[in-house]
């Protein structure tokens, strides 16, 4: 049994209004001996699930893949590329670092541009695979309301469930329209936040770049901790050599 990301919707009315929660990925569950398929420990994200497609045109040297929406939860961005000749679909993953990246690494980079929008960047064929000419890039993502969606705990499922059914020599997804049980939610929604203020970006960006994702000095910790725990308000770090008596080789956060 599969639960599709597209249209996979959970609705909840809370104090701040009515909100939609979605899943960015297709989720699959295998029925047990009792014939019941259980979807467990599923993370759902506040916001509407959207998709955007781009056609790769090598003749356009300035071709850009810009997502038209603001307030995108960048952790939910998913990218796939369909070859225009063979129809083969390849999934691309977000860059984490460039270690062991080669010309066939299927990776993409998210770059924030003006007006709080995002551009999707790909490799050049040397560092990362370059989508072939004529292929179709499909980007899916969730547009969120930030912190307003926090506190939801009871949901109504209004998405799509299906199961694979053989139709001759072809296996097709067949919708499930009955015998769907209620949802169990172990905790209320949390950690939703608004887009990072420009002042924070200006302060942290050079420090993150200088640290190169290595935590050595106190300043390194100040810049890296927010990327690990994005919902903290502020960070202070200092070296043990500033204490009395000094504690060399330690950093306090």
What are these regions (language model features)?
Residues 1-10:
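Single conserved hydrophobic/aromatic residue that forms the stacking wall/gate
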Residues 10-11, 79, 137, 225:
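Buried hydrophobic packing residues in well-ordered domains
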Residues 76-123, 127-129:
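Extracellular/luminal ectodomains and secreted, surface-exposed scaffolds of diverse proteins
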